[in-house]
Structure formats: structure tokens, C-alpha cells
Amino acid sequence: MSDHWPKHARGWSLVGPPLRPCADDIEIALHEVSLASPRDTLVLGVTPELIATMPGAIVAVDREPAMIDALFEPAPDRRALVGEWLALPLPDASIDVAVGDGGCSVFAFPGEYRAFAAELARVLRPDGLVVLRLFTFQPETLDDVRAALPSIGSFDALKWRIAMAIQSPERSVQVSAIRDAFDALVPDRAALAARTGWRREVIDHIDIYRDSPARYSFPTLDEVREVLAPELVEVSVTTPRYELGDRCPTLTLRRARR
């Protein structure tokens, strides 16, 4: 997996919504985070849109130095640490709010989701908040995606629909299989670009998935709720209105009282 994320970092400018947060997502996250009036904010990853807008003193944690080097811009009250989200390099009860964008999908479901909830509960102060934009599964087949192709509005929406359509019943899909399924579904990339107006370099960015051992997971919203409890208690869920917004809800949770 070590080569997948450096490639992703180098091609960040080619990634768009819903894989990358749009203004609606940032507005939702900022509203939810502000409920905590945080002094100390943990950003899971180095998503530039989150780091630029979240309140409080920010510490960003990412496992990949290449992601930090490519995307993180230091500033007063802003620092980045190399570390694992399942073993955060932070003291107990040191964070008021943790916010992340889509990162749960890198975890193996359900075990790593449970471990993640426990680790967030460890670093959060009492009544601390967690704000997570999720990528959640809704059932459809590749034939459904093929039939919907004329109405799909962006390449990244297409890519995510393919990924969810081919994941296993255990909620796991190998990244390289997403590219293979795309090539089988759309054998003529030039024709796709001409018909849709999508930039060819955006379409070809899927080639970073070739031979990648990384895996993604897309559980349903209810499945996520179940595995994050009892460490984290749901406060609210907000669903945006853009394409695939129903698969990209923002879930706000509070550390359970002990």
C-alpha cells in the first residue's frame, strides 16, 4: 500500500467531488465542529479544505509523509504528524473535536472501524465531538452503473459507483479491481472524454489504481453506526444534495460518557 498514497498525493489536483470535499461538505463540517467551540482540533489526514477552515489549534495526522509533504501548509496553530489513525500519536483526552473526510473507507470493516472508535474515544476530552464524512454503500450492479452512464455527472462519481458495485458482501474491494472494472465497462476512454467533456487526465488518473494492494470499504450508514457504538454516540447526520450526496453523509458523534 506504500506506493498508492504517494501517487494519490501527486495527483490530488485531479481528484474531484465526491471523493474530495466540496463547499457544501466543508460548510456542514464547519457547522458541526463549531458546536464544540474547540481549542484543539484533530484533522484525520491532510485534506487541505478541512485544514484551511477548521477552528482551533489544528493537529493533522496522516500515515504517509508524502501526503503531508504534498498537501500540508504549516501555519501558526497548525501542525502535522506522521502517524496511524488506529494508534494516534496524541495524549489521552487532548482533543476537543476530531474531523475527517472519507477516511474511514481505508479501514477493514468491521474490526478496524471498532478500533478507530476506541482510539478516538481515547484522545477526545469528555463530551468531545467526532465529525466524519462517510462513503456509504447503496446496492447496485455494474449493469445498473452501465445503464446510468449517460446521466453520471463526473468521473469521480462514476469511479465510486463502480467501486461500490463490485465490493464484496464483506464490504471490501481491492483498489486495482476498481480500475479493471472501469476498463471493462468503458473500453474507449477517448470516446468517454469526448461524450462527457471530462478531462482525459482526470480519467487516466484511475491508472494509479493499477496493481495497488490497497483496499477500500463501503459499509452502509447503519453498519457504521453500529460498529462505532458504544464508544461514540450519534448526535446527528447530515446528507448533502449534490450527486451521490446520499452516499456521502456527515455523521456527528460524541464521546460516550464514562
Give names to the regions the model predicted.
Residues 96-112:
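A short SAM/SAH-binding and catalytic strip from SAM-dependent methyltransferases
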Residues 213-231:
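Short alpha-helix
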Residues 114-129:
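A short glycine-rich, Lys/Arg-flanked "PGG" loop and its adjoining helix->strand segment in the class I
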